[in-house]
């Protein structure tokens, strides 16, 4: 990504479409262990809806508000699982993801667009109902570890206060 720092269009394409541009990422999408884990949830017939790389630069205030992915993908009630891989340490200090366990059972809730400058979501979208932060769990991952979550699950992440980037990769699987 350093080589692309002065080429924002190319960097944007890489972050948004790693499965189409990076052979190693395309191989990860088809990893038998990953497919087995996702198949246990969705069944054997899977399709990749999309993928992306998420970079939180070191010592930045960037964050992600509480949200549900399916509210802005146009898939409302899809049977979907996101596999989120840590490509670097994902700790509380580096802004790891936070989940509210069981919140996916609430289905879709109202969201609002804030367009907040430091929010990493495209429109600064956030859940417009109260989220009990005390129920949240931190998803701390080492490089190479992954978490799975449904697009209805309430999730967020804080800023990266460490000296290193926090980098993650997401692969979104759906039933065709």
Predicted regions and their residues:
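Short, surface-exposed loop/helix-turn segments at secondary-structure junctions
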Residues: 9-12, 68, 121-133, 163-165
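Non-heme Fe(II)-dependent double-stranded beta-helix
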Residues: 1-75
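Double-stranded beta-helix
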Residues: 92-158
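Short, solvent-exposed loop/turn segments at secondary-structure junctions
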Residues: 54-56, 71, 90-92, 104-105, ...
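Short, conserved beta-strand element in jelly-roll/cupin
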Residues: 41, 67, 74-92, 140-143, ...
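Aromatic-acidic/polar surface patches that form glycan- and anion
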Residues: 23-30, 76, 133-142, 162
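Non-heme Fe(II)/2-oxoglutarate
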Residues: 3, 146-148, 152-176
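Residues that flank catalytic or metal-binding motifs in active/ligand-binding sites
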Residues: 21, 49, 79, 93-95, ...
């Amino acid at each position: 990504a350093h080589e692309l720092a002065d080429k924002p269009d190319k960097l944007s394409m890489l972050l948004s479409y790693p499965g189409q541009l990076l052979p190693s990422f395309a191989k990860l999408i088809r990893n038998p262990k990953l497919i087995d884990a996702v198949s246990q949830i969705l069944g054997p017939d899977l399709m990749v809806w999309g993928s992306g790389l998420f970079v939180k630069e070191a010592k930045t205030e960037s964050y992600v508000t509480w949200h549900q992915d399916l509210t802005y993908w146009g898939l409302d009630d899809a049977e979907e699982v996101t596999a989120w891989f840590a490509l670097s340490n994902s700790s509380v200090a580096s802004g790891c993801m936070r989940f509210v366990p069981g919140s996916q059972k609430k289905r879709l809730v109202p969201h609002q667009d804030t367009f907040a400058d430091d929010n990493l979501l495209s429109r600064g979208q956030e859940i417009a109902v109260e989220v009990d932060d005390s129920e949240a769990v931190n998803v701390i991952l080492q490089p190479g570890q992954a978490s799975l979550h449904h697009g209805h699950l309430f999730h967020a992440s804080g800023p990266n206060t460490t000296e290193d980037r926090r980098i993650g990769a997401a692969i979104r699987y759906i039933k065709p």
